[in-house]
Amino acid sequence: MAMLPVAQLYRRDVPALHTPEGADLLQVLWCPFDHQAMPRTTLFWRSAATVSDILNTPPEPPAMRSDGYLPEPCLLNPEQVTEYPDHLELSKERREQLGAWSEWQAAVTDVDDYASSPELFYDRELAAAPGWKVGGWPRWGATDPTPRLCPACGSDMDALLTIATFEGDDDRSWLPNEVREDREHTGPSSRHTGPEGQAVIDFFRAQGIEVHDRGRVPRDARVAPLGTNPAPRQPTAVQIGSGYDQQLYVCPAAPEHPHSELMH
C-alpha cells in the first residue's frame, strides 16, 4: 500500500525544526490504515536541493481506513508561540501553586467557572497549544503522561510534530487567525495584551515563571460562537481517532534513530 504525504517542512520556514546534518527538509508520510489505533508514520530527512520531479497533486490511494487519513492540501503560515507543559508534568511544588485559587481570582477576572479545578484553567488557557505544531508539549487528557525514550539509545526524546484533528476549541484561548476572523465580533489583535492577559502574565512572573503573551487571544475576541464553516477548525480534514492528536518524537542525539509516536 502506497503511503500518503502528511507534512513537508523546510528548515528555512520552521527554525525550531532540528534536522540531521546535511538535511534541511522533513517529509512525513503515513499508511492510511490503523497500526495500533493510528496511522503509522515514516520520516524522510532530505536536502531540498536534491528534490526534483515534484508532483503538484499527490496520487490518492485505492483504499484507506478513513477519509480522515487523507489530508487536504494546506499552505502553512507558521507562527512561533510560547507554551507550557500540562499540569500533570509539573513538579509537586508547581502544582500546589496552580491550586492556589485565591491568587488566580486576584489576578484574573471572570474565571469562577474554574474554581473547583484551577489546573483546568491553566491547561486550557496557558499550557500546551492545540493544533498542528513543531516541537512543543503534548495535551494530555485521554492518558496520563508517558515516558518518551529513544528505542535505540534510551535518551529522552523530543517532540517533533503534532498532527492534530482540530486547530482550536471553543473554550480555549489558543485560536488560529482564520477562526478569530470568522467570529462575528473579532475584538483586538491576538498580539495585544489587555488588562486580563497582563494580570495572568504578572501572576506567573511573581511565581518565578517567565510568561509571554504571543499566541493568546483576548477574551473579548472569543465571545462569539464558532462560525458555521468547520474548515478553520479542521483545515487539513485529518481526524485521529475520535478527535485526538498524534505526536511524533525523535531522538535529540541522533534524529536518524527510529522515531516514536503517541496518540493523546
Q: Where do the protein language model's features map onto the residues?
A:
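Preference for intrinsically disordered or flexible, low-complexity segments
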Residues: M1-H264
